């Protein structure tokens, strides 16, 4: 393997407090399905008063923010050719920039106009940060921004690219970083050692452009990585890349699947629920609903339902057990990002025009209860941490939070506590 060390253009340092809590560490949250537990106090009355802070970003990015303890991390790409790759760290409290690192891209930076080089979402194990760009540059930093290792994957795999841009986000399973570098030429998926960045495994993948991200699910009590492509979904062992099961009836190449327990909900001929067989056993097709067809947004799993948004901006709630559609509500689109939810009974989604919508999921039918207009283009998916939403637009990073309790409310809460 040939490692390529980038030129570090800026160096600062900040100590991470001991015991910092990692919460939203990857694309679509801790479970990779858009939902998170324990955030009951997220704002439901979205308005300008909900904006806790807004900070400018030096370049475009489609990747979501990730949150580790009290820090928010985003990637960006700037310059006329988007060849300046950047990682930025902000305080979640006030949006203060804590550090930024800049690197020169070693791979191709050509992209379709709507997307950009900083399309993948970074991932963290709570100790280090791993960032991948469309240029196939893979960088590992510690949480102080110190460089640990880099891989210029184009140096090792020179034909691994497509003219539209890459967007698949890496994930971490155990001590392995899994990434899909799928395209119409040198297409592959690989597992990288977290500490060194060296290949643990590499497998060939279908030669076709693909923007989906890997998903983890349990299969027979064992964690399996699901790799989605136009051919279907392949389940592999995260440590070795060896095949465990294969669903070969096709799937989408834009919205990714979502898992809950041992069940995978895949955008495949509409929406398909699968229970893969353990140890290479037969995969069970639980149900398929051709009329429930996700568009760009990936399915969201929250409670006993799976939520999808179709190409006309209609949000549907589906019973996870049997695929029955329970209700539909029309949202203001268009959408490129995916919905997220917490256990406060509400769903959040931002459209391409910068309008954030909060949907109450607690009733017999969903209803939009509030909106916020940020006035900037948003192609990304929001993240959740504590009692706040974090969303990046083309030019800014935003924190959306509820209003702090009044003095009287705080005193009443204190008096009612045991």
Regions found by a protein language model. Give the residues of each.
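Noncatalytic, solvent-exposed loop/strand surfaces
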Residues: 18-418
């Amino acid at each position: 393997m040939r490692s390529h060390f980038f030129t570090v253009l800026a160096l600062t340092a900040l100590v991470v407090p001991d015991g910092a809590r990692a919460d939203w560490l990857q694309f679509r949250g801790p479970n990779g399905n858009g939902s998170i537990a324990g955030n009951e106090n997220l704002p439901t009355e979205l308005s300008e008063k909900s904006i806790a802070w807004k900070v400018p970003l030096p370049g475009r990015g489609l990747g979501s923010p990730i949150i580790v303890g009290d820090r928010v991390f985003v990637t960006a790409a700037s310059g006329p050719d988007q060849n300046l790759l950047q990682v930025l760290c902000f305080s979640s409290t006030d949006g203060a920039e804590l550090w930024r690192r800049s690197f020169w891209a070693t791979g191709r930076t050509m992209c379709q106009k709507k997307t950009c080089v900083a399309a993948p979402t970074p991932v963290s194990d709570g100790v280090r940060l791993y960032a991948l760009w469309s240029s196939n540059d893979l960088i590992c930093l510690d949480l102080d921004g110190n460089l640990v290792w880099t891989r210029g994957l184009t140096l090792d795999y020179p034909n691994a690219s497509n003219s539209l841009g890459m967007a698949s986000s890496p994930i971490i399973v155990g001590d392995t970083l899994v990434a899909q570098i799928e395209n119409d030429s040198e297409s592959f998926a690989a597992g990288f050692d977290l500490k060194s960045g060296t290949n643990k495994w590499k497998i060939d993948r279908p030669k076709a452009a693909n923007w989906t991200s890997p998903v983890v699910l349990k299969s027979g009590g064992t964690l399996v990585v699901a790799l989605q492509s136009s051919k279907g979904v392949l389940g592999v062992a995260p440590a070795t890349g060896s095949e465990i099961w294969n669903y070969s009836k096709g799937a989408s190449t834009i919205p990714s699947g979502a898992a809950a327990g041992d069940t995978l909900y895949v955008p495949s001929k509409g929406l398909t629920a699968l229970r893969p067989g353990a140890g290479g056993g037969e995969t069970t097709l639980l149900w398929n609903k051709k009329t429930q067809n996700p568009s760009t947004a990936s399915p969201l799993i929250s409670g006993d339902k799976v939520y999808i948004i179709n190409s006309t901006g209609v949000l549907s709630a589906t019973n996870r057990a049997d695929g029955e559609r329970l209700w539909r509500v029309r949202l203001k689109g268009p959408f490129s990002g995916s919905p997220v939810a917490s256990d406060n009974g509400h769903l959040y989604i931002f459209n391409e025009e910068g309008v954030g919508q909060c949907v109450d999921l607690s009733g017999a039918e969903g209803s939009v209860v509030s909106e916020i207009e940020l006035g900037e283009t948003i192609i990304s998916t929001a993240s959740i941490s504590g009692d706040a939403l974090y969303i990046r637009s083309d030019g800014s990073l935003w924190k959306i939070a509820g209003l702090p309790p009044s003095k009287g409310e705080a005193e009443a809460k204190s008096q009612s506590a045991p």
